[in-house]
């Protein structure tokens, strides 16, 4: 297991984390660190604890022992007000979107603003419309309901909602799952732009090797309850660890892909 040392630029620090459900051990002695303004991927087989670790980082579940610090705050020390304040500083895009079917897109994106701010309805709608433009959807999409959107559009809409509060930190759960190759490539580009233009720190769970090769600065491979290795995809592809090699087997992964160049910073992405 690779253990990282403390860094002043760390946005997330996890130390000696252990989690169990009854007799089933999910994590034991997990250590990892996510650096500011990097795209960090969590990989591993089914049951390796990726989703549980994500839930612990976003305060949906508590580990049995160990520490998690997010944006400089020890998650064990939070009261209700501090929890609410910290949650305002990150956004989450869940695997299945989590859009409310009874609300149109503009209303869905505006929900975090209604929950966490005292802004008036007109300003909330204006911000939501800007987020729609930001993630590359047409303005009239705001009046549509989730059932009227394609899978790729729903992913973008979920991402727009995660960005509603202008977070410093973004969590993505399987952002390309269920998408066709063209839509998945669009998500790749979008993730890069969010980091490069806005300086977001991005943590993602993914099984998509193409996404990891294209956008991840570093990847942590989980297995047997712990972190098997952390490094760039190039570094991981050269390791002999069987728990890591499984991600580089098969026809699709036999030839390592070169990291795709960062997309050009289009003027529409420049902060106003």
Identify the residue ranges that each predicted region occupies.
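The feature captures the beta-strand-to-loop junction immediately N-terminal to the Walker
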Residues: 43-45
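Helix-to-loop junction immediately C-terminal to a conserved catalytic motif
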Residues: 58
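Conserved ABC ATPase "signature" region
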Residues: 74, 121-140
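Conserved ABC ATPase signature
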Residues: 145-149, 153
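Conserved catalytic motifs of ABC-family nucleotide-binding domains
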Residues: 166
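Catalytic Walker B motif of ABC-type/P-loop ATPase nucleotide-binding domains
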Residues: 170-173
């Amino acid at each position: 297991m690779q253990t990282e040392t403390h860094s002043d630029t760390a946005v997330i620090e996890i130390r000696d984390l252990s989690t169990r459900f009854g007799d089933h051990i999910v994590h034991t002695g997990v250590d990892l660190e996510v650096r500011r303004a990097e795209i960090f991927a969590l990989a591993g087989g089914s049951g390796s604890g990726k989703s549980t670790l994500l839930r612990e980082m976003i305060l949906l579940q508590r580990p049995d022992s160990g520490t998690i610090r997010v944006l400089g705050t020890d998650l064990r020390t939070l009261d209700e007000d501090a929890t609410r304040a910290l949650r305002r500083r990150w956004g989450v895009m869940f695997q299945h979107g989590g859009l409310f079917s009874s609300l149109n897109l503009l209303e869905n994106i505006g929900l975090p603003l209604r929950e966490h701010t005292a802004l008036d309805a007109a300003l909330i709608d204006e911000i939501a419309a800007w987020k729609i433009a930001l993630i590359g959807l047409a303005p009239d999409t705001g009046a549509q309901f989730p059932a009227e959107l394609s899978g790729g559009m729903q992913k973008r809409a979920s991402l727009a909602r995660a960005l509603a509060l202008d977070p410093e930190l973004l969590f993505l759960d399987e952002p390309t799952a269920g998408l066709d190759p063209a839509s998945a490539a669009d998500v790749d580009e979008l993730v890069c732009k969010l980091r490069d233009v806005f300086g977001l720190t991005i943590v993602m769970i993914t099984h998509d090797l193409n996404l990891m090769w294209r956008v991840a600065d570093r990847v942590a491979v989980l297995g047997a309850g712990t972190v098997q290795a952390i490094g760039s995809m190039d570094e991981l592809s050269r390791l002999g660890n069987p728990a890591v090699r499984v991600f580089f087997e098969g026809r699709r992964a036999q030839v390592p892909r070169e990291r795709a160049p960062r997309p050009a910073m289009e003027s529409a992405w420049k902060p106003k």
